[in-house]
Amino acid sequence: MRDYRDIIIKPVVTEKSMNLLADNKYTFIVDKRANKTEIKNAIENIFEVRVASVNTMNIKGKPKRMGRFEGKKPDRKKAVISLKPGHKIRLFEGM
């Protein structure tokens, strides 16, 4: 079993994700191999909250160029976590 901190990579801090905070939804970049159950367990254990639902989406990396060299940004997986009423993640407070 993987460590919970290996599943949750980082929070997403964008205008859209900050607007979702009003609906008690939090957005994170997660490990591409993680499923919804693993993500739910990781969030509940790291932040000590109760998760209502997990929505995930796979994001393809954009093509990038550096001079004559072509490449692409890495693919990633994003998870939108809905918490049960009365629960908040302190990491996002004050944003």
UniProtKB/Swiss-Prot annotation:
InterPro entries: Nucleotide-bd_a/b_plait_sf, Ribosomal_uL23-like, Ribosomal_uL23/eL15/eS24_sf
GO biological process, one term: translation
Transmembrane segments: none
Domain of life: Bacteria
Gene3D superfamilies: 3.30.70.330
Keywords linked to the UniProt accession: Ribonucleoprotein, Ribosomal protein, RNA-binding, rRNA-binding
GO cellular component: ribonucleoprotein complex; ribosome
GO molecular function, one term: structural constituent of ribosome
Keyword Lipid metabolism among UniProt keywords: no
NCBIfam families in alphabetical order: PRK05738.1-3, PRK05738.2-4, PRK05738.2-5, PRK05738.3-2
Function: One of the early assembly proteins it binds 23S rRNA. One of the proteins that surrounds the polypeptide exit tunnel on the outside of the ribosome. Forms the main docking site for trigger factor binding to the ribosome.
Subunit structure: Part of the 50S ribosomal subunit. Contacts protein L29, and trigger factor when it is bound to the ribosome.
Family, as annotated: Belongs to the universal ribosomal protein uL23 family.
Protein name stated in the entry: Large ribosomal subunit protein uL23
Species this chain originates from: Syntrophomonas wolfei subsp. wolfei (strain DSM 2245B / Goettingen)
